[in-house]
Amino acid sequence: MTSYCGSDSPDGGAVMSEIETAIFTIITSAGEARASLYQALDKARAGEMAESEQCMIEADTQLKKAHDVQTELITRDLNGSLPMSLLLVHAQDQLMTTMSEQSLIEHMIGLIRDIGMNGGK
């Protein structure tokens, strides 16, 4: 089994370190976005719609950051210079899941807003 970390990699680990940093940026940003999304939902349920919107904006900012890094990695992959790793698969999964949750939470907050405006009818 080939290890791409440390001295086993062709470049002494420099490329993998850069890739790992990018992967952890995706994971961290997706995690921060997920936390902001659920905070937005909690705020909406409490009737704090302005605060909820701020949390949604923060989540969107974090997801854009993760997506931008993902796009850079995909470009490297198309050029054939990105080694596959389980950590990368995990990062992709975290980002995709959070993006799906964003869509669902946006709809849930919309329903909360609608119910609030209609007095629960």
Task: Describe the residue ranges of each PLM region.
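Terminal alpha-helical segments
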Residues: 2-121
